[in-house]
């Protein structure tokens, strides 16, 4: 079996975890108490959903997941919520004091007290796996636990499980709205620390998702529940090929092989279609061509940036539902003829396709319409460098005045770490710039240097 272990860190990670597991349970027909009426084989570990759920002798299905937060309130909601019986109490780990939006607290002072406990729980989960394929880590960039503790955990996972892939789902600080003043510091410190430990990081920015909820679902004031359910759909689409049988299935390592041209350039942009409310869906027939085109609209992206200004390096289309290869090929052929979509010249084909016959499931009483087919596009584009540039600029404004730095130094960090992290991100921006340059020009320039 190719099992995946999900690790949800901090408030954002835990709340997205709730949305994801709620959706997985609905998709697989697993009840909140872990029973699965449709699964006749007790303890049989060969069903494809066993990548995400382990099965006890009593026929109970337990998520292969760990929830960690440095303060108890958010995880307590899981402990008392609808799905409280689904999780083993040991999978829900909380500390007593908050990381207080401070990377240094999450990474050094408070994080180090709890990290061994978390790794121990992860080890117990990995012992139940026959062929662990990797970890999915959910966290935010802006919070103290999400930035500091997640990066500490990933460093330690690299030591203990060197060869296993680690995929991140990270909540990137929104351009306009901010939940903490020190977000730019935390984001840049965590990106610098995890850059070498993460194999692939899918970024999601709250503002982009707010806009999608407002525009496509007509929700005037989207709540985090609305956002998380939408994020849940996306995560579900990315992991669907691991949990269901399909025509063209995609494995965790396959994402990396097809999306990451260079180790550092591992931040694919995620687009999902169709996001549509129930009343609208009733009147529209969403064909494969339509949803494929929708993926290339910046309005459907999960991070605010404009791919029309950048170039695509690789593109992964994950279809689910009533989709046949013939339609997909036709849709992609049409996309390739459009001038607005530019690929780097060193990557001529650039499309990888996955097809899964399980149609998208929606949460009852949610905002999304039940549709016959959906697509999630993961694209590695140079445009995402805009997001880094934005963040770096905010960091520079604050760091020039050394604002708030004493909180970090007081928790045992050194000021040198700030400048080191900032230099690393400057290098990352440069890397993105260089991949986008056409190779022919590049060769000519190299000739002049010698």
Curated annotation (Swiss-Prot):
Spell out the PROSITE patterns in the cross-references: TUBULIN
Q: What cofactor is needed?
A: Mg(2+)
Recorded hits in SMART domains, A to Z, give: Tubulin, Tubulin_C
Sorted keywords for this record are: Acetylation, Cytoplasm, Cytoskeleton, GTP-binding, Hydrolase, Magnesium, Metal-binding, Microtubule, Nucleotide-binding
This chain belongs to which protein, by name? Tubulin alpha chain, testis-specific
User: How does it get modified post-translation?
Assistant: Some glutamate residues at the C-terminus are polyglycylated, resulting in polyglycine chains on the gamma-carboxyl group. Glycylation is mainly limited to tubulin incorporated into axonemes (cilia and flagella) whereas glutamylation is prevalent in neuronal cells, centrioles, axonemes, and the mitotic spindle. Both modifications can coexist on the same protein on adjacent residues, and lowering polyglycylation levels increases polyglutamylation, and reciprocally. The precise function of polyglycylation is still unclear. Some glutamate residues at the C-terminus are polyglutamylated, resulting in polyglutamate chains on the gamma-carboxyl group. Polyglutamylation plays a key role in microtubule severing by spastin (SPAST). SPAST preferentially recognizes and acts on microtubules decorated with short polyglutamate tails: severing activity by SPAST increases as the number of glutamates per tubulin rises from one to eight, but decreases beyond this glutamylation threshold.
Q: Where is this site: Involved in polymerization?
A: 450
Binding annotation for GTP: 11, 71, 140, 144-145, 179, 206, 228
Name the job this protein performs: Tubulin is the major constituent of microtubules, a cylinder consisting of laterally associated linear protofilaments composed of alpha- and beta-tubulin heterodimers. Microtubules grow by the addition of GTP-tubulin dimers to the microtubule end, where a stabilizing cap forms. Below the cap, tubulin dimers are in GDP-bound state, owing to GTPase activity of alpha-tubulin.
GO MF entries: GTP binding; hydrolase activity; metal ion binding; structural constituent of cytoskeleton
Annotated domain remarks:
The MREC motif may be critical for tubulin autoregulation.
Q: Which organism is it from?
A: Oncorhynchus mykiss (Rainbow trout)
- Determine the domain of life of the protein's source: Eukaryota
UniProt motif (MREC motif) ranges? 1-4
EC assignment: the record states 3.6.5.-
Q: Which residues bind Mg(2+)?
A: 71
Where N6-acetyllysine occurs, the residues are 40
Q: Which residues of this protein are catalytic?
A: 254
């Amino acid at each position: 079996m190719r099992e995946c272990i999900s690790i949800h860190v901090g408030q954002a990670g835990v709340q997205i975890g709730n949305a994801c597991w709620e959706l997985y349970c609905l998709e697989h027909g697993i009840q909140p108490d872990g029973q699965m009426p449709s699964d006749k084989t007790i303890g049989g570990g060969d069903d494809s959903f066993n990548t995400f759920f382990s099965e006890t002798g009593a026929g109970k299905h337990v998520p292969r997941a760990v929830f960690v937060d440095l303060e108890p309130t958010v995880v307590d909601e899981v402990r008392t919520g609808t799905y409280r019986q689904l999780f083993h109490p040991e999978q829900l780990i909380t500390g007593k004091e908050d990381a207080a939006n401070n990377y240094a607290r999450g990474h050094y002072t408070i994080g180090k007290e709890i990290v061994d406990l978390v790794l121990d729980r992860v080890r117990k989960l990995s012992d139940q796996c026959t062929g662990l394929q990797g970890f999915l880590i959910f966290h935010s960039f802006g919070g103290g636990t999400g930035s500091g503790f997640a990066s500490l955990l990933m460093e330690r996972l690299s030591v203990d499980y060197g060869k296993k892939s680690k995929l991140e789902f990270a909540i990137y600080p929104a351009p306009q709205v901010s939940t903490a003043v020190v977000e730019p510091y935390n984001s840049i410190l965590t990106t610098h620390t995890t850059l070498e430990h993460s194999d692939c990081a899918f970024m999601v920015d709250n503002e982009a998702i707010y806009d999608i909820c407002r525009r496509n679902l007509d929700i005037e004031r989207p709540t985090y529940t609305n956002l998380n359910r939408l994020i849940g759909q996306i995560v579900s689409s990315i992991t669907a090929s691991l949990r269901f049988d399909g025509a063209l299935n995609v494995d965790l390592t396959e994402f990396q092989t097809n999306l990451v041209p260079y180790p550092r350039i591992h931040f694919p942009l995620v687009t999902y279609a169709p996001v549509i409310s129930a009343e609208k869906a009733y009147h529209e027939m969403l064909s494969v061509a339509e949803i494929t085109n929708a993926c290339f609209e910046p309005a459907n992206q999960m991070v605010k940036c404009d791919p029309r200004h950048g170039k695509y390096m690789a593109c992964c289309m994950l279809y689910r539902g009533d989709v046949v290869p013939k339609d997909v090929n036709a849709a992609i052929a049409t996309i390739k003829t459009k001038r607005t979509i530019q690929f780097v010249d060193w990557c001529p084909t650039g499309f990888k396709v996955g097809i899964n016959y399980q149609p998208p499931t929606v949460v009852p009483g949610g905002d999304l319409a039940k549709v016959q087919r959906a697509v999630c596009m993961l694209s590695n584009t140079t445009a995402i460098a805009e997001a880094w540039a934005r963040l770096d600029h905010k960091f520079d404004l604050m760091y020039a005045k050394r604002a708030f730095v004493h909180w970090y130094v007081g928790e045992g960090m050194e000021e040198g770490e700030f400048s080191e992290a900032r230099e690393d991100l400057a290098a990352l921006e440069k890397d993105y710039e260089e991949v986008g340059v056409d190779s022919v020009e590049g060769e000519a320039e190299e000739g002049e240097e010698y």
